Amino acid sequence: LMGWYSEVARDLNKIPDAISHFESELANARAEVKLKGNVERAAAEMPGIVEQRFAQLQEIEAILNYLNIECRRLRSSFFKKYLENYQRALSSRDVEKYVDGEADVVDYEKIINEFALLRNKWLGLLKGLDQKQWQITNVVKLRVAGMEDATL
């Protein structure tokens, strides 16, 4: 099974599909943050849930890093073009400004921004799972202390 990182690295047109996939997975994962039902079962399921969702976050991080690398490469090619082909001498600062305005660079940075937002949503999910683990631990401690009626 090839992951989304490989798909995106092979074909940048797969980015919308990757975003849709991870948004859909995020919606499913949000249900896993809720603590309800049997505490023992919830505790037993937590390691697998955390491993799966953390691995997905790592794939998003890898795609984001790949996009940043490609954007730097694109910026570099425009930078070189301006330095070599412009009639008058330009300062590096001038060239930076021109490169910042290139449509391809702007489009890339928008995609990077969208992926960064997706990554941040997943970081929020992982924080929620951390809180769930903490709550499970507290409920178990209450039960050990004799407060059997701790309900969720």
Which residue stretches match the model-derived regions?
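Terminal, low-complexity, charged helical segments
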Residues: 1, 31, 38, 150-151
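Extended, charged low-complexity scaffolding/tethering segments
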Residues: 1-30
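Short, charge-rich amphipathic alpha-helices with coiled-coil/heptad character
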Residues: 24-55
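Catalytic phosphate/metal-binding cores of nucleic-acid and nucleotide-processing enzymes, i.e., regions
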Residues: 61, 81, 123
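Extended, amphipathic alpha-helical coiled-coil scaffold segments used for oligomerization/tethering
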Residues: 67-110
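Long amphipathic alpha-helical coiled-coil segments
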Residues: 68-76, 107-142
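Acidic, low-complexity, intrinsically disordered peripheral segments
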Residues: 143-152
